Amino acid sequence: MKDLAVFYEHPAWLAPLFAKLDERGFDWNPLPIQDHVFDPAAPPPAHVVFNRLAMSSILRQEEHGLFHVLAALDAWEGAGARVINGARPLAYDLSKARQLALFHRVGLETPRTLVAHRREDIPAMAADIGYPVIVKANIGGSGAGVARFDSAEELREAVSTAATPIGVDSVVLVQDYVPARDGRVIRCELLAGEFLYAIALDGAGSTFDLCPADVCLAEKPSITVSAVQPPETIKGAVRRVSELAGLDVGGIEYLIDDRDGQARFYDFNAMSNFVAKPHEVLGFDPHDDLADFLEGEIARAGATA
């Protein structure tokens, strides 16, 4: 049995990780999700399994593997494997509604949100919240399943033509539109439950088309990336979110509401990749920290690194 298997869907996003694993001499196997088949009674594929599933995979494969992966991770955890970003954090990644409830549990503010499972309920939800509103699919990625509506007439037309987003799980969120101060969103990256770094994406507050890594911003030159230091209160809060969700590696995003200066949290991403050009932006390569973490987990799992 290999020490490590990386369960993944998007090889381009994982290229820096794969290169680092080879550079450090890991005994590992890539495990593509697209055509994956598993036997629930069989042993796990490795002592340690690293889940790298992206929610945006629903855009790249009609017969997506989201719930297949959830079942596989649960089976492997039950069979004794150490699964990094296992079934518990994946269940949060699979539900924006659960993410918002988690943020509130920690005492964080979010955009005001109502959750339903029928398209016909959306207009009444929007009227309750007040325009403009954002309608979101419960499961999405890279901005998929997100639309802004500025009036009741516009929304009613979209509902009547079934043009409003709704999740692959039939759950939909209607959310207050929050104007991001200076058009900036901030992504906090965590590793092993600890704050690792944060980046500001300037210009991202006007778009929904963000993916798990700023490497995707190559075609969005209006968005710039820089390292930032959030307040200690926010660092502590995201650590608590990570702890409650069982998140080993991932990102949590927030923005500052330009109307009142309040930090509002809106996204939990267990597939958040590290910043591109890390030495230029951060002054260090977080893949080194990740490799150290993986070595430690392999050792704890009883394998040889």
Give short role names for the model-derived ranges.
Residues 9-112:
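Conserved N-proximal alpha/beta basic substrate-recognition cap immediately N-terminal to
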